[in-house]
Structure formats: structure tokens, C-alpha cells
Design a protein with these regions (language model features):
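Unchanged
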Residues: 36-59, 65-123
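A generic structural signal for short beta-strands and their flanking turns/coil linkers
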Residues: 4, 25-27, 32, 59, ...
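Conserved Nudix-box catalytic region and its N-terminal flanking loop in Nudix hydrolases
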Residues: 12-52
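Conserved N-terminal beta-strand and adjoining loop/helix that marks the start
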Residues: 1-17
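A periodicity- and composition-biased signal for non-globular, repetitive helical segments
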Residues: 27, 123-124
């Protein structure tokens, strides 16, 4: 059985991208995202995760690509969406301790290989 999840790459009008830091797991910066519920479409899951993790409501989601990968030895399918967000993120303080925009050339060092792969997919879709 392949687990499915969503990743949302949100940029602001200045072209900066939104990253979040979790209160659990390996410390570092990630794109907002999470699992897809049993009766949920990937797009609905993306909207829900953005709202839960950043407080931002998104209207215009674009599917950038689908990555089939292995996470912790198990098959995983990730639906990667992009959107533009105008509002300042407000992390919930429980699951997400920090959410902020970064300029592309000033991204934090502490980003996982999975996060970087998603960034590359997005960058190749934009150019």
C-alpha cells in the first residue's frame, strides 16, 4: 500500500517561499504539507494542511508534479502543489513552531533532501 501526501510550495508576491519548522521530529525547515485523508482529494488535503499549519487560506492551487519515492523504506506518493499567498502565516504553535518566507537565494541550510527535491521540481516548473 502506497501512502499519499501533499506538499504545498507557497510563494508571496515578492517571490519568497514559505517554509515551516515542526515542534517534533528532525529539526529543520520544510514546506507545509501532510497526509491525505481516506475520502479526501489531494487538492482538499493541500488546502486543509495549509490552513492547519500556517493559517493561510489558499484559493488558487496548481499541481506541479507527483513524486513517487521511498520514505523510511515504505512507498510514498507526494502530490506537489504551488500557490501564491498574500497573508502573513500564523503557525498554530503546537505542530508548527515557526512559519516564514525566505528569499530563494537565502534559503536556510537546514532543509532535508526531500524538501530540496520538491524545490527543484517547483523551480523547473516555473522556468
Amino acid at each position: 500500500i502506497t501512502a499519499e501526501g501533499v506538499t504545498i510550495i507557497a510563494s508571496n508576491p515578492q517571490g519568497e517561499i514559505l517554509l515551516v519548522r515542526h515542534s517534533y521530529g528532525p529539526q529543520g525547515w520544510y514546506f507545509p504539507g501532510g497526509g491525505i485523508g481516506r475520502k479526501e482529494t489531494p487538492e482538499h488535503a493541500a488546502r486543509r494542511e495549509m490552513r492547519e499549519e500556517t493559517g493561510c487560506r489558499v484559493t488558487d492551487l496548481k499541481l506541479v508534479g507527483i513524486l513517487n519515492e521511498e520514505i523510511s523504506g515504505a512507498p510514498h506518493r507526494a502530490f506537489i502543489f504551488s500557490t501564491v499567498v498574500d497573508a502573513a502565516p500564523e503557525p498554530d504553535g503546537r505542530e508548527i513552531v515557526e512559519a516564514r518566507f525566505f528569499a530563494i537565494r537565502l534559503l536556510p541550510e537546514a532543509m532535508s533532501a526531500l524538501t530540496r527535491r520538491r524545490l527543484e521540481l517547483w523551480q523547473s516548473s516555473v522556468n
